[in-house]
């Protein structure tokens, strides 16, 4: 046979048939991945969307209001700053101490604060009234503002009657954006950890278990009764015992397999501490001024020195911002007394 006629036959693919088994590998996840930064980025292109006759803020004011009380270390520094500012504020005939408290709190929470000037018949200002920043919107037309607590019935303010104090943003110039925006993820994580631990205790201090039964001696009625008893043991009053009678059952006929031991494996304390540090770093309030106990033996240091540094670095700039109303009114409406610790140290 010539070499040209010698052809190499292809090898047959060996197949193995194991009966009628059609087992296949399957990969699955318990939940879909959650994107952290995706669709919300398009809002940076929109800046402030026009809604009817006013601009909507770039950040949801309702969301900021809900997040305000989401975590202890988020609201406590804001209240602390507000309380110190109110204690140093000298009341004026146009602006009471209570109205100033609302004016300062809105600026600290929303980075926007609005004061409405009420005029007499001669055109003079008789009172400055704070308008809730959560519902106040800047109008599309110049020097116009709207109070929008309901889209069905918006209220327009008189032209040139609203003073708008804002913390400047890098993406738009219509509304202010809070400085603490970067720490909101830590605030929400802190809240989620607290809510999870609360549900964990309400569930009977366990993460759940699998009740495995392989004993043929049990009847369907017994299984249904056990299932009903387990359902009723969840929630309030969950610390109760269950009785199961199986005279012809096997030793391992009933097994309780715990899913996880949360008390030993979760990172509740670590999450709380890390998120607390993030929030305090963003708010720039010394921990000793908020009543936080130190974890080390050395403590946080001298509280008076920390208070003086806080007054110089944080309170003084806030006071300067809040006093911008004086230039708009043409009168010294907002004025502060000296901080006692700075006077005593001077």
What are these regions, as identified by a protein language model?
Residues 1-135, 174, 299, 303, ...:
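Flexible, gly/proline-biased loop segments at the beginnings
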Residues 109-111, 121-124, 141-142, 205-206, ...:
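Short, well-ordered loop/turn elements at secondary-structure boundaries
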Residues 116-118, 129, 148, 212, ...:
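Residues in well-ordered beta-strands of folded domains
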Residues 2-14, 18, 153-286, 290-300, ...:
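Extended, charged amphipathic alpha-helical segments
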Residues 24-52, 139-147, 190-212, 245, ...:
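Short, charged N-terminal helix-start/capping segments
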Residues 52-63, 90-93, 145-159, 185-188, ...:
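Short N-terminal helix-initiation segments at or just after the protein's N-terminus
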Residues 120-176:
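Active-site and NAD+-binding cores of ADP-ribose-processing enzymes
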Residues 95-99, 108-110, 128, 144-147, ...:
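Short amphipathic alpha-helical surface micro-motifs
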